[in-house]
């Protein structure tokens, strides 16, 4: 909205052109989402409590989690409301990438909402079945990937960018583009969902990765920076930094209430959606491999579950005390805050390594 106002009001006074600057709108979007998130926090938390939308704690989980019983869940509503409002205010709504990301956000939020609702109604950890979630996620992913491929205006939008190599861009067929995109989008969504098991564990890595993807989006949207880094120039990608800024603001605002000991949990409406958001942005920017490096913590959490299941079904033995791996460290006696902060640190290091690939070519 403000971008449009800047365009209109510049005819009256050139000073209003500042509303069109990406940097100004990114800062504005970040601060707006942060303020909305912090101010709405108590209201949404009280609403969730009044509706008895409370976290169910599994009896076979770590005993330290019993004290979390009764903590309101579905706090992802706080993240998504502040994120969406801020994006609509500060982003260029004529940019098709913004609408793709918002569409994915809404679609995965609906899946997460119904999953949370069923868990609350049943008072168990069983919401939608795994197959139901995969089917719904696949439908949204298929629509998104198909649109991205056939709406592409330049070759790099549908190509595979190989890290560490200059100008190594591999064209992709419709099938490969859509299939790999669906894999990344669904995988990212479920990876963040698996990671969201401790207070603040998932939200700060999401914020940090979102910020890093925003920098890549800005670089690829700027011809001079893209040429300097030997990146393909995607003229529309720069606008995604405004969305990433709103993601940072809403995420930090949520962390204010989600930090240990948490006053609210994001629920599947938050974790499934945030993972999908990161995935779709990485796909649009054609930096799926770089994203995999950044999201190493999410990847390891997912692999730990896969390894545990495969090992138990084939050998009858468990590799970890409990999966995902953050529960393994809990059962080894690590304090919850120590696990959380160390995973944050690992994420920060991985992001720095991933960003280094932009120049090491």
Language-model features and meaning:
Residues 2-43, 84-96, 100-110, 144, ...:
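Alpha-helical transmembrane segments
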Residues 51-53, 123, 269:
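Juxtamembrane helix-loop transition segments at the membrane interface in multi-pass membrane proteins
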Residues 57-71, 125-133, 326, 331:
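Juxtamembrane helix-capping/reentrant segments at transmembrane boundaries
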Residues 68-80, 132-140, 336-346:
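Select subsegments of transmembrane alpha-helices in polytopic membrane proteins
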Residues 94-102, 121-136:
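Membrane-interfacial loop-to-helix junctions in multi-pass inner-membrane proteins
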Residues 110-117:
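Alpha-helical transmembrane segments within multi-pass membrane transporters and channels
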Residues 119-129, 163-172:
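Membrane interface segments of multi-pass transport proteins and intramembrane proteases
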């Amino acid at each position: 909205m403000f971008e449009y106002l800047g365009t209109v009001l510049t005819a009256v006074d050139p000073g209003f052109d500042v509303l069109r600057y990406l940097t100004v709108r990114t800062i504005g979007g970040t601060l707006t989402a942060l303020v909305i998130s912090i101010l709405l926090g108590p209201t949404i938390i009280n609403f969730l409590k009044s509706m008895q939308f409370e976290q169910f704690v599994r009896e076979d989980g770590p005993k330290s989690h019993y004290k979390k019983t009764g903590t309101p869940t579905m706090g992802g509503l706080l993240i998504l409301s502040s994120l969406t409002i801020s994006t609509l205010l500060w982003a260029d709504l004529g940019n098709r990438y913004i609408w793709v990301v918002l569409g994915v956000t809404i679609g995965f939020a609906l899946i997460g909402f119904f999953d949370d609702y069923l868990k609350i109604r049943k008072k168990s950890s069983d919401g939608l079945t795994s197959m139901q979630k995969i089917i719904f996620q696949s439908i949204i992913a298929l629509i998104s990937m198909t649109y991205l491929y056939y709406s592409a205006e330049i070759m790099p939008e549908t190509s595979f960018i190989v890290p560490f190599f200059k100008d190594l861009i591999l064209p992709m067929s419709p099938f490969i583009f859509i299939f790999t995109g669906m894999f990344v989008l669904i995988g990212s969504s479920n990876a963040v969902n698996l990671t969201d098991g401790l207070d603040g564990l998932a939200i700060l890595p999401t914020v940090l990765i979102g910020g890093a993807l925003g920098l890549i989006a800005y670089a690829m949207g700027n011809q001079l920076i893209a040429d300097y880094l030997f990146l393909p120039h995607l003229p529309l990608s720069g606008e995604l930094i405004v969305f990433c800024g709103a993601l940072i603001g809403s995420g930090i605002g949520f962390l204010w209430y989600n930090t240990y000991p948490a006053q609210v949990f994001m629920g599947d409406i938050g974790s499934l959606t945030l993972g999908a958001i990161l995935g779709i942005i990485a796909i649009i920017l054609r930096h799926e491999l770089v994203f995999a490096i950044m999201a190493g913590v999410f990847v390891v959490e997912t692999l730990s579950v896969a390894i545990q299941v495969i090992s138990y079904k084939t050998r009858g033995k468990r590799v970890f005390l409990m999966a995902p791996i953050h529960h393994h460290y809990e059962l080894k006696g690590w304090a919850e805050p120590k696990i959380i902060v160390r995973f944050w640190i690992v994420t920060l290091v991985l992001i720095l390594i991933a960003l280094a690939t932009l120049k090491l070519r």
